[in-house]
Amino acid sequence: MFIFFINTPTPPNIFFSKNIKIKKLMRFSCTEVCIFFSLIFFFFFFFFCVNWGCENNLLSRKYQMNRDTCNF
């Protein structure tokens, strides 16, 4: 009886609940995640340009941006 209890598989409800949680986490596709992170990167770059101004920003010096484009 004890050996039979050890050999019984775990109840399927545990597996189903884990699969539902994983499906809820994976509802976004890879392209949506990539677009989301690229938008975040773009907004951080824009915020850095606006905050520091052109004379302090090495990237804006490299691309020769005007002061009007960085400081609003």
Swiss-Prot record:
Record keyword Transmembrane present: yes
Top-level taxon: Eukaryota
GO cellular component: membrane
Alphabetized UniProt keyword annotations: Membrane, Transmembrane, Transmembrane helix
Topology in membrane: Single-pass membrane protein
Residue spans crossing the bilayer: 33-53
Localization (cell): Membrane
Protein name stated in the entry: Putative uncharacterized protein DDB_G0292940
Taxonomic lineage from the root: Eukaryota, Amoebozoa, Evosea, Eumycetozoa, Dictyostelia
